[in-house]
Every structure is written in structure tokens, then in C-alpha cells.
């Protein structure tokens, strides 16, 4: 099994938005992933949107300012496909 984790600033000059990425693979299969857009608001990093495989299935969480989370399941997509969709959405 291999793992990869990194952070990319989406606005390198201001450094107020970043893309956090983690994925694990076995052979040629993505077995787990977690990626999210985070924004620096009020002296803290806050997740805005997250794609991951928590709860056993790939999905997207939109994290609203009032604390409410909206969840969308990607049941018809593989982990690798959902990871690609999430990367395209965030970056």
C-alpha cells in the first residue's frame, strides 16, 4: 500500500485558500482518499468542500458557514473517478 499527502495554495500570493490532498492505493486501486478546499477566515482554516471515502463510500460534503453539512453520494463512481471529479472541482 502507498500513501500520498500534500497541500497546494490556490492563491500563492495571499495564501488564503488551499487544497489539502490525501490518498492511499493498493496496486492500481485508490482504496481511500480525502481532499478538501480550505479557506483562511478569521485567523483559522475552515473546510469549505470535502470529497472523501469516509463512511465506506465516496461522497462530497459542502460545509456551510452556519455549520450545516450537505452530503452528496457518488455511488455510481469508483474512488478514483470521484477523486478526479473532486480535484477538478476544487483546483
Q: For each predicted feature, which ranges?
A:
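Negatively charged, low-complexity tracts enriched in Asp/Glu with abundant Ser/Thr
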Residues: 1-42
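A short, structured beta-strand/loop element
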Residues: 32-73
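Generic detector of leucine side chains in alpha-helical contexts
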Residues: 10, 16, 40, 63, ...
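Acidic, low-complexity intrinsically disordered segments
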Residues: 67-91
Amino acid at each position: 500500500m502507498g500513501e500520498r499527502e500534500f497541500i497546494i495554495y490556490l492563491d500563492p500570493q495571499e495564501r488564503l485558500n488551499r487544497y489539502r490532498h490525501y490518498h492511499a492505493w493498493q496496486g492500481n486501486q485508490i482504496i481511500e482518499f480525502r481532499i478538501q478546499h480550505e479557506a483562511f477566515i478569521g485567523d483559522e482554516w475552515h473546510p469549505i468542500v470535502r470529497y472523501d471515502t469516509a463512511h465506506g463510500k465516496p461522497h462530497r460534503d459542502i460545509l456551510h458557514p452556519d455549520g450545516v453539512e450537505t452530503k452528496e453520494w457518488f455511488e455510481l463512481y469508483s474512488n478514483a473517478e470521484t477523486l478526479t471529479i473532486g480535484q477538478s472541482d476544487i483546483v
